[in-house]
Structures are given as structure tokens and as C-alpha cells.
A protein has these predicted regions:
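Short cysteine-rich clusters marking metal-coordination/redox-active sites
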Residues: 8-11, 22-25
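Short metal-coordination and nucleic-acid-contact micro-motifs, chiefly zinc-binding Cys/His arrays
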Residues: 4, 18
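Hydrophobic alpha-helical transmembrane segments and adjacent short intramembrane/lumenal linkers
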Residues: 168, 172-304
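Short, contiguous pre-domain boundary segments
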Residues: 34-53
Length: 304
């Protein structure tokens, strides 16, 4: 059965009828209404060199469409793991802030310094493990949703093949003479690096960790001092976790996951699969809202 094709008006490359942008020069072939919103507008500029990692992260915050447009051209340089690392370091700083808010009676400088480092490392490791598991679980479930809405995995297999490709084994028929047209994407010449690229969509949770750090630094006030010999810091910390401030922290995480993350994950999936923005956005929001309810809104700390 023949497959409908469409020709790019800018570079002349032929793309499948289901493509929304030319795979080589980036020219939009089909335009959805939602792409009139700046956050979702596809970038059609020529690409020459990748942005530095810090500029990628900045654009993920202020202009995610541009960020993922750049990342998609050289996906192996995606800052996804850096974002996970920075977010985990912020967890460590949160632990440091919590410890410094304790009033410890009769503690020496050596004791305080040792416990400060211990709290930082403990929260850093917890943040890394927790977020690693959470992010990859979300990537898995977002992929399932995108498979339902736009056939995400099938599109990736069609564009990039299955598994790792050895350099120089690309079939000539899959390449266009326009594949290097003004910095064209050469999407067929690199692996999908799906997880690395989709990790970037969790930048909002990293930003929210900064907000949580500020909120806890201002609003975390444990009741009474820690008297060494009468109570342990562990038991005191457990009691402090019941303070109302944690409801605010949990709500910030829930709102971010339900409202902000779906926008970035939609653009990441759209750029990877060259698919519909609108259809991916619907499933991403449904998944995000559902997960935020189960993971965050059902936490005991949210309701005291």
C-alpha cells in the first residue's frame, strides 16, 4: 500500500503525509492552531551550532520550543542528566537549610559541622534516587500516552530504527540530498536518545526546588530546641515533618507537575516524533494531573 507523501516547499525534501515539519530543514508542513501560542510555535530557523548547556536550560524555562528545537539537532548533548543532578543538589541544600533551622542545645562546632554534611548528603542521595525513579516512571507513562495519541514508539522506530545504529550503516534511500541543507537536522544519522531528551522536560521541578528552598528557609520553624540526651535529631525531624509548611511544599510540586511539566513533555515528544502538538498535549495533561493526584495530593503531609 502506497504511503502519502508531501514535498517541502523550502528544500524540496519529501516527507510522509503524517509529518508536521520537514525532517531536514525544519519548515512547517502542517500548522495547528495551538502553535500560534509562542510556547508551542515550531522553530523554522537554520541551525548551525548547539547552544551551551546553560543556555539550553535557560530556554527550557523561558522558551521551551526553542530549547527542544536546539536539543533535537544534537540529542546526545541533551542536558537531561545535568538537570537531574542540579535538582538533586537542591534537595541537598534543602536538607542543609532544615538542619540549620534546628536549635540544638549543648552541641559543639564539630558535631554541628558533621551533622550539616550528613544532612546535605542524605537529602542529596534521597533526592537523586527519588527523582531518578520518578522521572523515568513519568517518561515511561508519558511514552505510553503518546503511543496511544500519536503512535510515538512507531514513529521513533520509523525515523531512527530499533536499537543502536553503527556509524556508516544508514541506508542511502533513507537520506535526502538536502540532509545538510543549511544545518538540517540529519535526524536519521543519530540515535533517538529519547530518555535524555525527555528528562529535560522536568526542568520545572528543578526550578520549583529553588522555590521550595526559599519557602522552607523562611517558613520552616521547628517547635522548641533539640536537647541532646533527651531527644534525637531524627525523632525531632520526624515531628517537624508534620508542620503545615510541608503542605505548601507538596502543593507546589503538584501544581508544577500538573500544569507546567506537560507543556515541556509535549514539545519534547512532538520534536522527537514530528507529530501533532494538540494530540500529545491532551494525553500529557491527563497523565500529569492523574499522577500529581496520586503522588502528591494523597501525601499525608498535604492535609496535616
Amino acid at each position: 500500500m502506497s504511503v502519502a507523501m508531501q514535498r517541502c516547499p523550502r528544500c524540496g525534501n519529501e516527507s510522509s503525509g503524517e509529518s508536521y515539519a520537514c525532517s531536514f530543514c525544519g519548515k512547517r508542513l502542517r500548522i495547528e492552531r495551538i502553535e500560534r501560542i509562542p510556547f508551542f510555535r515550531r522553530i523554522e530557523e537554520d541551525w548551525f551550532n548547539p547552544y551551551p548547556w546553560y543556555l539550553k536550560i535557560l530556554y527550557l524555562i523561558i522558551n521551551p520550543a526553542r530549547a527542544f528545537w536546539d536539543i533535537n539537532h544534537l540529542r546526545k548533548k541533551s542536558p537531561g542528566m545535568l538537570i537531574l543532578l542540579f535538582s538533586s543538589l537542591l534537595y541537598g541544600l534543602i536538607g542543609l537549610v532544615l538542619f540549620n533551622r534546628f536549635r540544638i542545645s549543648g552541641a559543639s562546632i564539630t558535631f554541628t559541622s558533621a551533622y550539616s554534611i550528613a544532612f546535605f548528603l542524605m537529602f542529596f542521595l534521597f533526592g537523586f534516587i527519588y527523582q531518578f525513579l520518578l522521572f523515568y516512571f513519568l517518561i515511561w507513562i508519558y511514552t505510553k500516552g503518546a503511543n496511544y495519541s500519536v503512535g510515538f514508539t512507531q514513529r521513533l522506530e520509523k525515523r531512527f530504527g530499533i536499537g543502536r545504529q553503527k556509524q556508516g550503516t544508514i541506508e542511502e534511500k533513507k537520506l535526502s540530498p538536502f540532509s545538510i541543507y543549511k544545518g538540517g537536522t540529519l535526524l536519521q544519522k543519530q540515535e533517538a536518545f529519547k530518555s535524555k531528551m525527555m528528562l529535560c522536560a522536568f526542568t520545572p521541578l528543578m526550578i520549583m526546588n529553588i522555590v521550595k528552598l526559599i519557602v522552607l528557609a523562611i517558613g520552616f520553624n521547628p517547635r522548641g530546641p533539640v536537647v541532646l540526651g533527651e531527644s534525637t535529631i531524627d525523632s525531632f525531624l520526624a515531628a517537624s515533618m508534620k508542620l503545615p509548611i510541608w503542605s505548601v511544599v507538596d502543593a507546589l510540586d503538584a501544581i508544577t507537575l500538573a500544569a507546567w511539566v506537560p507543556i515541556l513533555i509535549t514539545i519534547a515528544i512532538r520534536e522527537l516524533s514530528n507529530s501533532s502538538t494538540y494530540r500529545v498535549l491532551i494525553t500529557s495533561y491527563l497523565i500529569s494531573i492523574t499522577v500529581s493526584i496520586f503522588i502528591f495530593f494523597l501525601r499525608p503531609t498535604l492535609f496535616g
